[in-house]
């Protein structure tokens, strides 16, 4: 019986050789099937197998592209699981913990990178590198409050909140996002934010992906955030930073190392927490995300998976028929990625998701409260740590209130199936049947440390306008 089983589970010598370079101990059968499928494709190309073995056996040496034909949807199916080919083979031979194509970037030597949309796609794992989180420069907080109260932006912030429409504006991805680089949507005249970097700092850096989004690579990492010139910087061992940004505050006084206290960004244990709501009722406990890839879906997975928040498990005695019906349509929900200091939301549900992210809206030049519709199979960058760092570095020079206002940027609201805003009959997110609130811990903790260093506000913050 054993001999019969081994007869039907025969592995070719070529597959065995390639599996010798496999990384990690998990998913042996899946990896074997993935390699077997690849060998069948490569055997049709002269020298392809040899080139792959050369790349795997000599990681530090130059190697050529190893290509396979691109499928219609760009994905490859291995044992009932579909994935992007370069991600699959990078996972097998280099990074077993790889979660998403957002984590990979092709090397310059690669002639057939996945993102180039050519008929052939390179699967050489040594033609890709893993995206690293950029190091954010510390925020320099003045030790003494030399800021002129007349320059306070508190009035502007209050005007902005007063001028906010009763209902948020709406934008649909990707239709509303194709704006000329030199003409973003106008901000409110009282907007506390500088012009959108989508049009100024790095105009050719798309922050989102089209309907084929799971098969597109993100843009290059944007330039570092603004820092004062070297002779104004606080610690002697600080790294030199780009000072060419056109977003430098014009009224910033000259500061010396004795006058400022640097506050550094620290990556928290849990990068975010997610809270689920039905109408205006919070349901269940908060989900704390430690994995950089998190699924929020409508199913019931009792296994307590740390990278999955199953809304189907949560009960609510006040649930009405509209909520029940909406929950049935959440399906695969949304996939959240935290990669290289950026947060992406990919809609896996058959129904659209609706996102209100002030950071995303700032980048695209939308009004801060705009709600963006993300259709099924699309992904959108909803937060960028480096843009946030730029805003924080500038806000420090405008006082406590300006920094405190940035807390709104660290919370992202997202509804499933049903939208809200000017184009929908629901005016507020609390009128949607099923929605989540995402709190970004890293930026929030950074703000907290900066505010603590700044001391008390010039004008007490209150709920009274």
UniProtKB/Swiss-Prot annotation:
Residues 13-137 form the MH1 domain. It holds the Pfam family MH2. It is found in: Cytoplasm; Nucleus; Mitochondrion. The modification N-acetylthreonine is found at residue 2. The modification Phosphoserine is found at residues 463, 465. Residues 198-214 have a biased composition (Low complexity). Disruption phenotype: Disruption of SMAD5 gene leads to the mid-gestation death of mutant embryos largely due to extraembryonic yolk sac defects. Changing residue 80 to A: Exhibits impaired binding affinity to GC-BRE DNA sequence. Keywords: Acetylation, Angiogenesis, Cytoplasm, Developmental protein, Differentiation, DNA-binding, Metal-binding, Mitochondrion, Nucleus, Phosphoprotein, Transcription, Transcription regulation, Zinc. One of its GO terms (molecular function) is RNA polymerase II transcription regulatory region sequence-specific DNA binding. Its main location: cytoplasm. Predominantly expressed in mesenchyme and somites during embryogenesis, and present in many tissues of the adult. One of its GO terms (biological process) is negative regulation of transcription by RNA polymerase II. Transcriptional regulator that plays a role in various cellular processes including embryonic development, cell differentiation, angiogenesis and tissue homeostasis. Upon BMP ligand binding to their receptors at the cell surface, is phosphorylated by activated type I BMP receptors (BMPRIs) and associates with SMAD4 to form a heteromeric complex which translocates into the nucleus acting as transcription factor. In turn, the hetero-trimeric complex recognizes cis-regulatory elements containing Smad Binding Elements (SBEs) to modulate the outcome of the signaling network. Belongs to the dwarfin/SMAD family. This is Mothers against decapentaplegic homolog 5. The gene is Smad5.
């Amino acid at each position: 019986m054993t001999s019969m089983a081994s007869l039907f589970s025969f592995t070719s010598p070529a597959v065995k050789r390639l599996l010798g370079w496999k990384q990690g101990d998990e998913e042996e059968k899946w990896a074997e099937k993935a390699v077997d499928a690849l060998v069948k494709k490569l055997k049709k190309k002269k020298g392809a197998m040899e080139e792959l073995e050369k790349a795997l056996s000599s990681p530090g040496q130059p190697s050529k592209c190893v290509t396979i034909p691109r499928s219609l949807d760009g994905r490859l199916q291995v044992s009932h699981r579909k994935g992007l080919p370069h991600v699959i083979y990078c996972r097998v031979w280099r990074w077993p913990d790889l979660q998403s194509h957002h984590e990979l970037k092709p090397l310059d030597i690669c002639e057939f990178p996945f993102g180039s949309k050519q008929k052939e796609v390179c699967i050489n794992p040594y033609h890709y590198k893993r995206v690293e989180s950029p190091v954010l420069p510390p925020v320099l907080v003045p030790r003494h409050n030399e800021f002129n109260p007349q320059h306070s932006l508190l009035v502007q912030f209050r005007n902005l909140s007063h001028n906010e429409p009763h209902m948020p504006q709406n934008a649909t991805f990707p239709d509303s996002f194709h704006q000329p680089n030199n003409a973003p949507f106008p901000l409110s005249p009282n907007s506390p934010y500088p012009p959108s970097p989508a049009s100024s700092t790095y105009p050719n850096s798309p922050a989102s992906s089209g309907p084929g989004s799971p098969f597109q690579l993100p843009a290059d990492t944007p330039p570092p955030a603004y820092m004062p010139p070297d002779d104004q910087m606080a610690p002697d061992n600080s790294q030199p930073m780009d000072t060419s940004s056109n977003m430098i505050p014009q009224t910033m006084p000259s500061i010396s190392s004795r006058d400022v206290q640097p506050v550094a960004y620290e990556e928290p244990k849990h990068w975010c927490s997610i809270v689920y709501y039905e109408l205006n009722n919070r349901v269940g406990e908060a989900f704390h995300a430690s994995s950089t890839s998190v699924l929020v879906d409508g199913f019931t997975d009792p296994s307590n998976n740390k990278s999955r928040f199953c809304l189907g498990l949560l009960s609510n005695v006040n649930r009405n028929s509209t909520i029940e019906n909406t929950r049935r349509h959440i399906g695969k929900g949304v996939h959240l990625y935290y990669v290289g200091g950026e947060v992406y939301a990919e809609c896996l549900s058959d129904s659209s998701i609706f996102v209100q992210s002030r950071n995303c809206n700032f980048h695209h030049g939308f009004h801060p409260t705009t709600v963006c519709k993300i259709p099924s199979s699309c992904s959108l960058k909803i937060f960028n740590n480096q843009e946030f760092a730029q805003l924080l570095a500038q806000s420090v020079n405008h006082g406590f209130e300006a920094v405190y206002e940035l807390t709104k940027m660290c919370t992202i609201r997202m509804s499933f199936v049903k939208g809200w805003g000017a184009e929908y009959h629901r005016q507020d997110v609390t009128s949607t049947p099923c929605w989540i609130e995402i709190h970004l811990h890293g930026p929030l903790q950074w703000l907290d440390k900066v505010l603590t260093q700044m001391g008390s506000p010039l004008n007490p913050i209150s709920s009274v306008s």
